[in-house]
Swiss-Prot record:
Protein known as: Putative amino acid transporter YuiF
Protein topology in the membrane: Multi-pass membrane protein
Gene behind this protein: yuiF
Species of origin: Bacillus subtilis (strain 168)
Localization of this protein: Cell membrane
Taxonomic classification: Bacteria, Bacillati, Bacillota, Bacilli, Bacillales
Any one of the GO CC terms: plasma membrane
Length: 442
C-alpha cells in the first residue's frame, strides 16, 4: 500500500483517538518511511533533516506569543473586555447579545480575510488578537469551534480566489507549474475558474454558523502572563503604537525586502513596549518567557510536521500516489475529477501546505486532464481545488494550527476535535463537491 496513504491515515486515526498530535506525527512518519522502503536509519534521518523546515514559523510564533503577553501590561485586553461587556449589556438582553456575537464574528472574519491580502501577515495576528477575546467569547457563550471555522475560512478562501497578497503567490505558482506541464493559461482566468470551488467553502462557512450558533459554556481562566492590568489612555495608545510598529516592520520586510518579517515585527513591538516603560525591566524576562511558553506547543507541532512532510517526500510515494490514481481513471471525466481531488486532499493533509502540493500534482494532473478532454478552465479548477483541499482540516497546517494557538490559550480548545474536525467537515467536503461540479461544467 502507498506510504503516503498509510502515514496520513495512521496520523489522523491516532489524532482522532486523542493521541498527542506530536506523537501521532512521529509515529505516522516512521510508518510512512518504513512502508516506503527507506529503512529505519533513512527514515529517522529524513525526519530530523526536515525538522528545520518550519523553524522560522515556530520561532515567529514564540516571539508573537511574547509580544501578546507583553501587550497585557498595557491593559489593552482588559479595555477590550470592558468595552465588549458594555456593548453586550444585560445578560437578559438576548437581542443585544446576539447582535454582539454577529459583530464579533464579522470582525474576526474580515481581519482573517485581510491577513491574506490587504495586510498580508497571514497567521501573525492570531496570538495577538484572539487570546484577549476569550473572556468575551465566554461572556457571550460563543462556541469556539465556530470561531475556528471563521478564522480558517479567512486564512484559506481569499488566497484561493483573490489574486493579491498570498493569492498572487498561489495563483502564480498554479500558472507557472501548469505551463511547465504543458498547458499555458492566462493568469486572469484563474480566479474565475476557482469561483465555484470557493463558493463551496462559503456554503461550508454558512453551515458552520448554523451548526455552532448555539450557546456553549466555558470556564473563564487566567491566561499565563495575562493577569489584569490597570490601563490609561496613554497605555492604550502605546499598545496601539506597538501593534502598528509591529505590523509595519512585518510588511516592510515581507513586501519590500522579500524576507520573513514576523520575528522582527514582534521584536519591534516588544522594543516599543520596553522603551515606553509599559514593560518593566525586572518583569520583562518572566513575561516574555510566559508568552513564549503560551505558543510552545504550536511551535513543536510545526517543527514535527515539517519532519513528517520530509519523510513522505523522501519515500517518492507522493508522486507514486498521483501516478497510481491516474491508472484507475480510464476515460471517465467524472471519476477522474473525483480521484484527482481526493489525491490532492491526501497529499495536502500529509504535507500541510497547499502551496507545496501544487508542483507535486500538476506534472501528472495536467496531461491527465488534457487526455480526458477537460477544458483549460476545468483543469484550473481541478488542480486549484485539489491543492487547496486539506489545508483546512490538516493537523499539520498553519491554517488550523493558527486558530488553535489563539483559542487554546486557556487550555479549553482541542486542536483535533475543536479545530481540525470541524474545518475538515465544513470546508473539505464542500470543496470536493463544488470542485467536482466545476470540473464538469466549466
Amino acid at each position: 500500500m502507498n506510504a503516503v496513504v498509510i502515514a496520513v491515515l495512521l496520523m489522523l486515526v491516532l489524532s482522532l483517538l486523542r493521541v498527542n498530535i506530536v506523537i501521532a506525527l512521529i509515529i505516522g512518519a516512521l510508518a510512512g518511511g518504513l512502508t516506503g522502503g527507506l529503512g529505519l536509519g533513512e527514515t529517522v534521518k529524513a525526519f530530523t533533516d526536515g525538522l528545520g523546515g518550519n523553524a522560522t514559523v515556530a520561532v515567529s510564533y514564540a516571539m508573537l506569543g511574547a509580544f501578546a503577553a507583553a501587550l497585557t501590561k498595557t491593559g489593552l485586553p482588559d479595555a477590550m473586555v470592558e468595552a465588549s461587556v458594555k456593548l453586550i449589556g444585560n445578560k437578559e438582553d438576548s437581542r443585544k447579545k446576539a447582535l454582539s456575537k454577529v459583530l464579533i464574528v464579522l470582525i474576526i472574519l474580515i481581519v482573517s480575510c485581510f491577513s491574506q491580502n490587504v495586510v498580508p501577515v497571514h497567521i501573525a495576528f492570531i496570538p495577538v488578537l484572539i487570546p484577549p477575546l476569550l473572556k468575551i467569547f465566554n461572556e457571550l457563550e460563543m462556541d469556539r469551534r465556530l470561531i475556528a471555522c471563521v478564522i480558517t475560512f479567512g486564512l484559506t478562501a481569499p488566497y484561493i480566489l483573490l489574486p493579491v497578497g498570498f493569492g498572487q503567490i498561489f495563483q502564480g505558482m498554479l500558472k507557472d507549474n501548469m505551463a511547465d506541464a504543458g498547458l499555458n493559461v492566462p493568469l486572469a482566468d484563474i480566479p474565475y475558474a476557482l469561483i465555484i470551488p470557493v463558493a463551496g467553502m462559503v456554503v461550508g462557512l454558512i453551515l458552520s454558523v448554523i451548526v455552532y450558533r448555539k450557546p456553549k459554556q466555558y470556564e473563564t481562566k487566567d491566561i499565563s502572563g495575562a493577569e489584569a492590568s490597570p490601563y490609561t489612555r496613554k497605555s492604550i495608545g502605546i499598545a496601539v503604537l506597538a501593534i502598528v510598529v509591529s505590523l509595519g516592520v512585518q510588511l516592510y520586510l515581507s513586501q519590500t525586502l522579500g524576507v520573513e518579517g514576523m520575528i522582527m515585527g514582534a521584536l519591534a513591538g516588544l522594543i516599543v513596549l520596553f522603551v515606553s516603560g509599559v514593560m518593566k525591566r525586572d518583569e520583562a524576562d518572566s513575561l516574555i518567557t510566559d508568552g513564549m511558553v503560551l505558543m510552545a506547543f504550536i511551535g513543536f507541532v510545526m517543527l514535527v510536521a515539517a519532519g513528517f512532510s520530509n519523510v513522505l517526500t523522501k519515500t517518492g510515494d507522493v508522486e507514486s500516489l498521483v501516478k497510481t490514481s491516474a491508472g484507475f481513471i480510464g476515460h471517465s471525466q467524472s471519476l477522474g475529477a473525483l480521484l484527482m481531488l481526493i489525491v490532492g486532499l491526501l497529499i495536502t493533509m500529509g504535507i500541510g501546505s497547499s502551496f507545496a502540493t501544487i508542483p507535486v500534482i500538476t506534472t501528472i494532473f495536467v496531461p491527465l486532464c488534457m487526455q480526458l478532454g477537460f477544458s483549460p478552465m476545468a483543469t484550473i479548477a481541478i488542480i486549484g481545488a485539489a491543492a487547496a483541499l486539506g489545508d483546512a482540516g490538516s493537523p499539520a497546517s498553519d491554517s488550523t494550527l493558527g486558530p488553535t494557538s489563539g483559542l487554546s490559550a486557556d487550555g479549553q480548545h482541542h486542536h483535533i476535535w475543536d479545530t481540525c474536525v470541524p474545518t475538515f467537515i465544513f470546508y473539505n467536503i464542500p470543496l470536493v463537491i463544488f470542485g467536482w461540479i466545476a470540473a464538469l461544467v466549466l
